[in-house]
Amino acid sequence: MGVIEAPQWLLPAFTRSVKAIGATQPPEAIGSAGELLIERWSTPDRRFHNLRHLIDMLARVDELAEESHDPDIMRVACWYHGCVFSSDVEEVIRGNGGEDETASAAFAEADLRHLGVPMETVKRVCSLIVNLKRHMLADDDIDAQALIDADLGTLAVDPQTYTEYVRLLREEYSHIPVE
């Protein structure tokens, strides 16, 4: 699923959220950044951690929005949380396989600064992304907890959907021996 196949609402939703967190660049520049993210989420090596995963996570953030402090910051963190991805064997062995939250946060920082998002907000987005790697947070960080719930919501599904998740994940890493 690339830019052409992405739902029509997806790119405008990205632009709205980035504007809502303080971006000063025009909508066209924000849209270009969103198109690049859609391309990153749509590479052929992503069998599970793809645009569908991003859309599902955004939907779960929307479900939790009333319980959060800043859902737009959470939405932007969703967009960037897995924008750097590798299923390379060496990356997997080093613990950076799949969605590389640390590299994704660095990408987000550069991109959001370029879009004119205030530095304090950029740091918050990046901290939410990095925290997804550990899934361990302070009890008083509601937005971080909600974002983790949105990310791990993949596991809280019916058995058939979970079976499909496992199948796609195995495809994503089919070049790595199971044992």
Where in the sequence are the language-model features?
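An active-site-proximal "capping" alpha-helix that borders the catalytic cofactor pocket
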Residues: 57, 98-115
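Acidic/histidine metal-binding catalytic segments
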Residues: 30, 69-76, 115-130
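His-Asp-centered metal-binding catalytic motifs of divalent-metal-dependent phosphohydrolases/nucleases
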Residues: 57, 72-90, 104, 126-133
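Divalent-cation-assisted or electrostatically stabilized phosphate/pyrophosphate-binding catalytic cores
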Residues: 92-99, 103-106, 172-179
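Active-site flanking loop/helix segments enriched in acidic
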Residues: 31-60, 83-95
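Divalent metal-dependent phosphate-bond-processing catalytic cores, especially two-metal-ion Mg2+/Mn2+ enzymes
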Residues: 2-23, 42-49, 60-70, 80, ...
